[in-house]
């Protein structure tokens, strides 16, 4: 066999193999297709079964949800029905209770009406009895109802008035005792620490002469020397029979001091003529000015007050030559400063401010003859001008009541001023003013109704008033004393205090026969 044979055999075999392979492949493809169809049918059946199951499950869940909703609605309806039934029962109970209360109220109203009727019957009976009793009382007493009411009211009024007066008296006495006790403690302590020793000033000064011949030289030829001296100083020279003495008379202490110094220098010098007199008067004025400044500085040093304007110091020095009722004003101011400071310390108030006001309180008297107005107001304006504080300005202006005090220091200075002025021997007043004050005191007392007589005693520091017992009772005496005190305080000016003593005396006299 040749190669061609083998090739043909090989080709045939290959063809057979290809055919067999195609058959096998086709068979496998058919098998796979059949299996795929089966799988598709199986999956479809499973999907249909799942869908049916889910459908049934959804239907079941919907039925269950509907059942739950129906049960919830039924439960809520049941609860609402129960609530409505409960409210209905409560309303029924309340209606029953209201019916019972209404019935009880009707019963009470009926009972009250019966009681009201009984009360009206009793009142009518009582009114009838009262009218009978009133008629019987009027017949027995001889007084009408209005007269009896008036009598009773008058008795009650007198009793209340008496009790009120007694109560007021007790309160006033207690308050006065407490206030006096504390005031005495403060003032006594202040006074015992402040020893002021000065005498009353006068309006005249006596200059001693070496011999009586000097009188003629002072008078000079045709009186030229004495006229020159009087003209330059403004002081009257009184030359009388008094041996070896010349009297200088003048109300201005500064002028009087200038005249005294000039005259004493002229006497020592021995040369007395108008030109020399003029020279000595000028020297005396300069000496007095220096003395004024020194006195002001000494006053501030003595009281411990610093920072005063130089003009205020000069005005303080001028107060040495001023008097008030014979009391030296500068020494009085120093005394008031010490007293105010001591009382302020006792009361826990700033003593420095109180002392400052006390020292300056009468500063207006240094210029009051040059400026019109009360010295307190003048002093406050001066203090304001030289830049003192508002409290100092107010306290100076208020120490005599010309201004309303705005600080405790102002009130303390008022008290210290009164203490210094009222100290025995500190001041004096003219006989005429003293007599007028006593007459005015008795006049105020005699103007009151029921006064029989009055006497001003103790140098005008006490007024004793005898009243008619048939006109005034004890309560009226208390009221009279209070009214007289108010009138004295408003109409009189006086140092210290005045005691008003109202005396009511009843005497019963019988004779045994």
Swiss-Prot record:
Domain HD span(s) in chain numbering: 329-422
One GO location term (cellular component): plasma membrane
SUPFAM superfamilies: Eukaryotic type KH-domain (KH-domain type I), HD-domain/PDEase-like
Keyword presence, Chloroplast: no
SMART domains: HDc, KH
Gene Ontology terms: biological process: mRNA catabolic process
Official protein name in the record: Ribonuclease Y
Organism of provenance: Clostridium botulinum (strain Langeland / NCTC 10281 / Type F)
């Amino acid at each position: 066999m040749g190669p061609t044979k083998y090739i043909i055999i090989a080709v045939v075999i290959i063809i057979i193999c290809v055919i067999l392979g195609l058959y096998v492949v086709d068979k496998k493809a058919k098998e796979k297709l059949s299996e795929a169809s089966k799988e598709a049918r199986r999956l479809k059946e499973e999907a249909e079964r799942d869908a049916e199951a889910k459908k049934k499950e959804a239907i079941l869940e919907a039925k269950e949800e509907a059942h739950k909703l129906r049960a919830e609605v039924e439960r809520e309806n049941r609860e609402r029905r129960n609530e409505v039934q409960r409210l209905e029962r409560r309303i029924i109970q309340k209606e029953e209770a209201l019916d019972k209360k209404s019935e009880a109220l009707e019963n009470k109203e009926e009972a009250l009406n019966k009681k009201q009727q009984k009360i009206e019957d009793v009142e009518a009976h009582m009114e009838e009895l009262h009218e009978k009793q009133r008629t019987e009382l009027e017949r027995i007493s001889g007084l009408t109802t209005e007269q009896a009411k008036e009598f009773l009211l008058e008795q009650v009024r007198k009793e209340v008035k008496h009790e009120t007066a007694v109560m007021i008296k007790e309160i006033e006495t207690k308050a006065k005792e407490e206030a006096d006790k504390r005031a005495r403690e403060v003032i006594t302590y202040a006074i015992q620490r402040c020893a002021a020793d000065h005498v009353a000033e006068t309006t005249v000064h006596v200059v001693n002469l070496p011999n009586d011949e000097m009188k003629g030289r002072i008078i000079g030829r045709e009186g030229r020397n004495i006229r020159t001296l009087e003209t330059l100083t403004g002081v009257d020279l009184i030359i009388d029979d008094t041996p070896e003495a010349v009297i200088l008379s003048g109300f201005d202490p500064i002028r009087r001091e200038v005249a005294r110094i000039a005259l004493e220098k002229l006497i020592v010098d021995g040369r007395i003529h108008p030109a020399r007199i003029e020279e000595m008067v000028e020297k005396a004025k300069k000496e007095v000015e220096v003395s004024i400044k020194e006195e002001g500085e000494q006053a501030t040093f003595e009281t411990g007050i610093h920072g005063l304007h130089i003009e205020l110091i000069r005005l303080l020095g001028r107060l040495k030559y001023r008097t008030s009722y014979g009391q030296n004003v500068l020494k009085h101011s120093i005394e008031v400063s010490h007293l105010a400071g001591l009382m302020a310390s006792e009361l826990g108030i700033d003593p420095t401010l109180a002392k400052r006001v006390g020292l300056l309180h009468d500063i207006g008297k240094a210029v009051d003859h040059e400026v019109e107005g009360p010295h307190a107001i003048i002093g406050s304006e001066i203090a304001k001008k030289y830049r003192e504080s508002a409290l100092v300005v107010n306290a100076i202006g208020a120490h005599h009541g010309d201004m309303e005090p705005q600080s405790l220091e102002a009130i303390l200075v008022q008290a210290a001023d009164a203490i210094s002025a009222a100290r025995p021997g500190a001041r004096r007043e003219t006989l005429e003013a003293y007599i007028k004050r006593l007459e005015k005191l008795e006049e105020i007392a005699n103007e009151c109704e029921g006064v029989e007589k009055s006497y001003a005693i103790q140098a005008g520091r006490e007024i004793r008033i005898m009243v008619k017992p048939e006109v005034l009772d004890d309560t009226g005496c208390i009221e009279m004393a209070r009214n007289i005190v108010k009138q004295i305080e408003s109409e009189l000016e006086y140092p210290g205090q005045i005691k008003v003593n109202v005396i009511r005396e009843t005497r019963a006299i019988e004779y045994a026969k």
